[in-house]
Amino acid sequence: MSDHSPLALAQALIRCPSVTPEEGGALSFLADRLSRAGFSVERPVFSEPGTPDIQNLYARIGTAGPVLVFAGHTDVVPPGETEAWTHGPFSGEVADGFLYGRGAVDMKGGIACMLAATLAFLDRHRPDFGGSIAFLVTGDEEGPAVNGTVKLLDWAKARGERFDHCLLGEPTNPDTLGEMIKIGRRGSLTGRITVHGRQGHVAYPHRAENPIPGLLRLASALTADPLDGGTAHFDASNLEFTTIDVGNPATNVIPASAKAVFNVRFNDDWTADTLGAEIRRRLEAAAGNAVRFSLDLQPSNSPAFLTQPDAFVDRVADAIEAETGRRPALSTTGGTSDARFIKDACPVIEFGLVGRTMHETDERVAVADLDRLTAIYGRVLDAYF
């Protein structure tokens, strides 16, 4: 097996214990392979008070445009109880056609495929392939995500780097390789409602003001009617309550306040501001003069965004269809990713491995999928340049 094969590269990366925020040797391995291939490689470290310093990697080969960026992360979530794994979480063992290890799917396997495809492409097209290839890789995606991609992009912009398109190798396929390309992501908004009452004894309710019925009224106002009916590329926005609490262990005390937390995953019909205004309007209408409440809205750094289907999306879809025989769906489902930052630098889409076992005990990827994803990325490179 060649040490440039996606399997060998993925095994080497998995054997680096890069549990966020630790680098674990993963970025160093990647930097070595890229520099040996002729890339200019830099390793900026970013800091933020109250968070760990994070190592990142930026590499580029070529000086001309267009510039295609491969993006991803080498940090992984903790493995949990290692004794529960059939094969060690950092062993990189292969059994029954599967590569096991933390990050096999999310997303060291994807990075290995990007690297393998790029090395093979350069072997075919050196010295001039009519553009530039860049790697934008962070060690802070599974953690707070404040010293990673968002700062790496600012750092690159300050140096005059400009990108034409980005392919982010997150695991996008629910069950089978080739099912799905992510062309956008929903936004996220968290809200905290506090209904204010007056504490008292349950036997003397006229001396108290129970906040719980008011909170139930407000919660019903937010869930009774849908926020929207969805858009061309997004499902309907969805609001879910995640906790309701009065902090009251006593059975004979009316609490002074009642609190609830909700999260909205919203589509491109809304911004955080317009959605917040609609939520406040519904609450105020339901409360009238009968319910005293306060609302704290916390937008994440995850606005809804969409990369419009274009020639680049078609190139990736064509490559997938050529290797898998299926035309991928263009989707905006799922949670957030670093694409939410990259979208401000250039058009970005996501395509990677099958995500069924990501973050699980015995996370694993089919070795055949590593080979096929490498071939897909190779076809993208051939079509792009």
Swiss-Prot record:
Its EC number is 3.5.1.18. The gene is dapE. The active site is at 75, 141 (proton acceptor). It is an enzyme of class 3 (hydrolase). Keywords: Amino-acid biosynthesis, Cobalt, Diaminopimelate biosynthesis, Hydrolase, Lysine biosynthesis, Metal-binding, Zinc. This is Succinyl-diaminopimelate desuccinylase. CDD domains: M20_DapE_proteobac (cd03891). HAMAP family: DapE. Zn(2+) 2 binds at residues 106, 142, 359. Pfam families: M20_dimer (PF07687), Peptidase_M20 (PF01546). Pathway: Amino-acid biosynthesis; L-lysine biosynthesis via DAP pathway; LL-2,6-diaminopimelate from (S)-tetrahydrodipicolinate (succinylase route): step 3/3. Gene3D superfamilies: Zn peptidases. Its cofactor is Zn(2+); Co(2+).
